[in-house]
Amino acid sequence: MANKENIPLYIKERFSALYQSDQTLKSLFTIIHDQEERIFCEYLESFILKEVTYTVFKSYVKKTAQYLLNNKITPNHEYVGLLMDNSLNWVALFWAILMIGGKPVLLNKKLPINITEDIIKLLDIKYVISDVHLDNKNYFIFDNQNKLLPEIESLDEVKKEDWENALVLTTTATSLNYKICIYQGKDIYHAVMNAKGILKKNKMIKEHYNHRLKVLAFLPFYHIFGLMAAYFWFSIFGRTFVFLKDYSSDTILKTIQRYKVTHIFGVPLLWNTIAKELKRKINQLPDKDKKKAYKGIAFSYQLQNLFPNYGRRIARKILKPIQSQLFGDSVFFCISGGGAIPKETLYLINAIGYPLYNGYGSTEAGITSVELRSKPKYRILGTVGKPLDSVTYQIDNDELLIKGQSLCSEIIYKDGQKHIINKDEWYHSGDVFKKDKKGYYYAIGRNDDVYVGENGEKIHPDEIEKYVLMTSVIRYCFTTYKQELALIIQLSKSNYAVKAETINKEVKDCLSLLKDKGYQINKVYYTFDDIANINAIKVSRKILDRLLNEGKVKLEDFNTFSSLVETKKEQLNDEIVHRIKMVFSDILNKDINEIGEEDDFFMTLGGTSLDYMTLLIKLEQEFETKITFDKKSFSTVKEFYDYIITKEK
């Protein structure tokens, strides 16, 4: 769709305002919210779409500042914790804390609460604004609804502002050793200015749908990726944010389609989930349709490599049935960051017409690079691009070193030690990188996460995971266990038996593929225990190692899986047949013992066509699946059983 505004001119005006600013957080607030009637966010209230302009939101922030003062939150340039999920009120509180002289500590809700409490104690935080009810006198409980709250709207704007110029982020603690990173206004300013170089290198990032650019607020704003790439890079241009009611896959997909979201930023877990769901749906199709779908995806990928923009438009047409079950046709730009992403995931998402780019950054250094080339053949390589304008890279002994003005100003370690960052010196990232002949960088793994093979070769598990996308298991992880390179898979207790054939095939194919790539996996283990926190965006090998040592995760040799499945299948067969019979019994008002496995629903049991429609609905609800017929319909318990078992696989 053509854009109503002159986007290049408006972008120039935005950067001009930044150039003329004093590079403080206060000036960023003014520049962001001085955008007349541009829409900051949209939300539904009583089934009515509400729009909040940046002008209205600016006033709301000032009223929120007064609300905090009224509730005796007077920071005096000390730390103030913010422990909430994304919402328009999270953003309002973030700015309001700064406005009344507080240093907002953006606490990570995905961390265990004991780590959060440690951070609060370490920084001596006297006020924590939270949407979590905890027995702690420091906590001020806030009703975190995603709407303008009447109790705040009714207040006057704060009269006296006392701006602070620092914000605080915490690392994700996947290594068990969290860090606290302090960013000054100038650091954030330089990070925001990186948007200029990105816009020059990639035109798709500016694309609108129906004259609007809307960003899904999926990534938490307390995460550097969410705060910088999603919030700051787009709010500076007055773009619209769409917040989620919850993080269920159904809510995410419906929200994207309902609000016509154009830009999505997520961690590999999101994209892997989408890729898994896509493969699952395609593989459930009849063979003819399945081959047609994969052929269409391959054609779309090839066409986009020849003509990126034209190919993407064609992809939206020929793959419309696939897109309609995912994000719809409004999504133009996606970025993955925060960990390794499989090549197959990058291929599938890009091929179906959703441009997915891979980026790199850290809490300490900010977002420092992203792959921005227009052809998907480059994006699926797994490169994280070239360094952004505010930083430079150097590789020393395989480790990435970073230097630049957008790094944080200070790091506070778990033991209380402080380290001031010298922007003219190299920062050791701890990440293993390589660089190709064209100057593009690749993240390989962590320095402290390496397996040394029998021949002395160093193997990084993250590098292995880039080749693998397993759809039949809950989570999987390549790691060193008992001094061997192992694959650990987490299975679902409820359906591992019916998925056994797929699980076995995926494990076999995975090992074969990796062997061809030169990786020998010595052992495969399975478990039904959680190998990561339910909220974790990826499996932390250090945390998994601790769980194994503490006996909280029990592993079984995968060689014993088949015998376990056979035992379970006997129980499962009886259970599924019983559940189907119960549905028959309920609809036909017959005793369950009167219903045989091969009794015809109509001829033997006396069901009507209306009863049959009810039967289909009830069975779909019972087994959480869609029943579709290929050549003939089903009318016996056995036929429905065979179909459900096949679908489960």
Show the residue positions of the predicted features.
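Gly/Ser/Thr-rich phosphate-binding loop
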Residues: 262-265, 277-378, 475
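Conserved structural elements of the adenylate-forming
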Residues: 60-66, 181-207
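Conserved C-terminal "lid"/linker of ANL adenylate-forming enzymes
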Residues: 508-568, 616
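Conserved AMP-binding/adenylation subdomain of ANL enzymes
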Residues: 192-214, 221-316, 320
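Conserved pre-ATP/AMP-binding loop-to-beta segment of ANL
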Residues: 37-39, 151-170, 176-177, 203-214
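Conserved AMP-binding/adenylate-forming core of the ANL superfamily
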Residues: 40-74, 78-87, 94-95, 114-117, ...
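Conserved AMP-binding A3 loop
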Residues: 51-55, 166-193
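Conserved ATP-binding/catalytic segment of the ANL
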Residues: 387, 391-394, 399-454, 458
